[in-house]
Amino acid sequence: MEKKRYSKRYCRYTEAKISFIDYKDLDMLKHTLSERYKIMPRRLTGNSKKWQERVEVAIKRARHMALIPYIVDRKKVVDSPFKQH
């Protein structure tokens, strides 16, 4: 059985030379969240270990401040979680 290979992805934060991830900047955080607002793994986002840890902390802070929900009802899952209706 062959291993599943993922395409090479590059860290968007390193390329953009960002020095700080703000938990209030949801446009930046939405790239690492799934449609159910779960944190996606590094192999899918392409983030480096350093930036993945910083993004996780920012997402957890945003959840604590109620900017992002902790859980989503299965019936209310949308295509894009940040799309305004």
Swiss-Prot record:
GO terms for biological process: translation. Part of the 30S ribosomal subunit. Forms a tight heterodimer with protein bS6. SUPFAM superfamilies: Ribosomal protein S18. InterPro entries: Ribosomal_bS18, Ribosomal_bS18_CS, Ribosomal_bS18_sf. Gene3D superfamilies: Ribosomal protein S18. PANTHER family: 30S RIBOSOMAL PROTEIN S18, SMALL RIBOSOMAL SUBUNIT PROTEIN BS18M. This is Small ribosomal subunit protein bS18. GO terms for cellular component: cytosolic small ribosomal subunit. It comes from the Bacteria. Binds as a heterodimer with protein bS6 to the central domain of the 16S rRNA, where it helps stabilize the platform of the 30S subunit. It holds the Pfam family Ribosomal_S18. The keyword Ribonucleoprotein applies. Belongs to the bacterial ribosomal protein bS18 family. Keywords: Ribonucleoprotein, Ribosomal protein, RNA-binding, rRNA-binding. NCBIfam families: S18 (TIGR00165).
